């Protein structure tokens, strides 16, 4: 990894006496697909050698779980191996104890006028992302832009991002298992008189936990428009995070699970470990990672794709859209390019 980032030009950034926010997802306890702390420690050590003052950071979550406040979040991070000793730097929850410590960054975007970004990330001099590249049930995949836009948003910011992404229930698929009811943090789901899950949209915040938990494809995202709008907003939040800051991005195309690391479980990887990629351009990086996964062979390990019909013909097909047909990840990259975050054109250089 160190050889890769040096080849990609990270040493061109002046790190001396600069606070560097290393934005990483600590993983929900129980999930085993997140980036291991060994990589974070190596990056922190490199940054220190360049004169930086690095810290690992993430913002609190909107949904129920063990990362919705700073106390539980830090305990979860430690449980997954992230602490000042193992990571070689401090661990800071960027939006504070209850997710209320944020700054509004005025960008006057088409969808978001003043994104709410975790204060510690705003106060940092430099932003460096370490991204686990994988599928995502609401955005198609999660990579650099997802880690920036959604990951750096405060709890209130996440509410704004999810405001157009409410799920629906395919009633014919519901098995009355009650798992979505038990795990909804906002008491927005109940079983109706027919024992079918029903969503109260006055309470639903669109976090997507029910979509991730449902084993029967009963809870699904509404339509392609909601995924597109969410990806547009994520791009604009990413712009707010990176505004006037030197930045660098590293994506781990390893343990490519079908869904995000926010849940306390993970499905089997869909493709072999494909390596690590790095760039100054988060848009080009996401596009390159997507293409690499799309063109990779599927693992024959009883995963989401290998269990699907005609799986032997999926090499070169859009694996993310096959897993999450209601999503449109391309829309997010196109909008990010439109607002000047980067370009989808790239050159792959193997190190």
Question: What residues fall within each predicted segment?
Answer:
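Extended, low-polarity segments enriched in aliphatic/aromatic residues
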Residues: 1-24, 29-39, 45, 50-58, ...
């Amino acid at each position: 990894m160190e050889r890769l980032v040096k080849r990609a030009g990270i040493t061109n950034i002046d790190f001396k006496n600069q606070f560097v926010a290393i934005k990483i997802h600590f993983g929900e306890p129980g999930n085993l697909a997140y980036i291991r702390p060994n990589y974070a420690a190596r990056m922190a050590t490199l940054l220190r050698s360049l004169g930086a003052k690095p810290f690992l950071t993430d913002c609190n979550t909107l949904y129920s779980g063990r990362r919705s406040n700073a106390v539980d979040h830090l305990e979860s991070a430690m449980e997954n191996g992230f602490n000042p000793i193992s990571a070689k730097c401090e661990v800071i929850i960027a939006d504070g104890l209850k997710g209320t410590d944020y700054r509004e960054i005025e960008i006057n975007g088409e969808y978001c006028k003043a994104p709410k970004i975790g204060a510690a990330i705003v106060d940092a001099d430099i932003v460096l992302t370490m991204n686990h590249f994988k599928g995502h049930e609401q955005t198609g995949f999660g990579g650099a832009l997802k880690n920036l836009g959604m990951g750096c948003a405060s709890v209130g910011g996440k509410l704004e991002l999810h405001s157009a992404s409410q799920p629906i229930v395919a009633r014919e698929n519901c098995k009355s298992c009650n798992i979505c009811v038990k795990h909804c943090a906002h008491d927005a789901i109940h079983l109706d008189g027919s024992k079918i899950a029903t969503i109260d949209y006055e309470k639903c915040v669109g976090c997507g936990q029910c979509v991730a938990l449902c084993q029967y494809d009963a809870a699904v995202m509404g339509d392609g428009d909601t995924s597109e709008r969410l990806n547009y907003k994520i791009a604009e939040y990413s712009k707010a995070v990176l505004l006037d800051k030197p930045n660098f991005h590293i994506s781990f195309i390893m343990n490519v699970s079908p869904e995000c690391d926010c849940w306390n479980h993970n499905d089997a990887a869909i493709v072999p470990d494909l390596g690590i990629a790095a760039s100054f351009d988060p848009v080009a990086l996401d596009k390159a990672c997507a293409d690499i996964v799309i063109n990779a062979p599927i693992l024959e390990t009883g995963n989401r794709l290998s269990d699907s019909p005609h799986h032997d013909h999926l090499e070169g097909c859009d694996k993310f859209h096959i897993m999450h047909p209601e999503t449109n990840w391309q829309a997010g990259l196109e909008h990010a390019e439109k607002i000047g975050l980067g370009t989808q054109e790239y050159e792959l250089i193997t190190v």
